[in-house]
Amino acid sequence: MASGKHHQPGGTRSLTMQKVSLRVTPRLVLEVNRHNAICVATNVPEFYNARGDLNIRDLRAHVKARMISSQFCGYVLVSLLDSEDQVDHLNIFPHVFSERMILYKPNNVNLMEMCALLSMIENAKSPSIGLCREVLGRLTLLHSKCNNLDSLFLYNGARTLLSTLVKYHDLEEGAATPGPWNEGLSLFKLHKELKRAPSEARDLMQSLFLTSGKMGCLARSPKDYCADLNKEEDANSGFTFNLFYQDSLLTKHFQCQTVLQTLRRKCLGSDTVSKIIP
């Protein structure tokens, strides 16, 4: 997924730019830190107030502190197609999911902050239209400073997630001027509409379009499941793995056992990459 090759001007780079615009979204973004025998994957703290105003100074300081920390390993993320993200389930085979998950550690502070904002978006339990607008504005500025393939991928993905939140929660209802949102994740729109449908139709449609058994069972408690994995595998890895996140619309996949297994394996044993798109 990542390499040290530089793009030559012309057709190759144009083709890559087209690939970035496809409906592929960075998901399940967490900050990964290791210290002694402890590995922790956690959401980025909420650097915003109740009105949705971003605390850019503290956010920037947090990101810069991560960059110079010997404990910081990078941001774990997975690239998902629009059709694979079914809100409560993932329509993707485990080996493909594993190949898509990376531990990303860019050398650029602006790319680091874009990852931090993505994590904040996904873990927002009660997002407001003010927060969504502030985050999008900040992402636009950060992307303009980088203007490379990774920043484009992160920007497009974050805009899609913000649009998903705005439309799913009707955050812009009654607004005089619509924001610069796109359609968001398509199956989240279906999920929202099915909540209003009669139970018979809802159950049938959910089983057809929003349910997949490819990734296996859900964990009753992600925290307890990770603790069980630690008991089983600590002797081999030498590390204890801990997961922290906020239960929100965009973090349901952390309840999947295969997601937790893959996340643990990647955080403990995966090499970092400095580029998402080579």
From Swiss-Prot:
Pfam families the record matches: Herpes_UL7
Alphabetical keyword list: Host cytoplasm, Host Golgi apparatus, Virion, Virion tegument
Asked whether the keyword Nucleotidyltransferase is assigned, the reply is no
The cross-references to InterPro entries, in alphabetical order and at most eight, read: Herpes_UL7 (IPR002600)
Is Zinc a UniProt keyword of this protein? no
Q: Name one GO cellular component term.
A: host cell Golgi apparatus
Q: Where in the cell is it found?
A: Virion; Virion tegument; Host cytoplasm; Host Golgi apparatus
User: So what does this one do?
Assistant: Plays a critical role in cytoplasmic virus egress. Participates in the final step of tegumentation and envelope acquisition within the host cytoplasm.
| Entries under HAMAP family matching the protein | HSV_CEP1
Per the record, the similarity remark reads: Belongs to the herpesviridae cytoplasmic envelopment protein 1 family.
The protein's assembly and partners: Interacts with BSRF1 tegument protein; the BBRF2-BSRF1 complexes oligomerize and might play a role in tethering the viral nucleocapsids to the host Golgi membrane during secondary envelopment.
Q: What is the protein name for this chain? A: Cytoplasmic envelopment protein 1
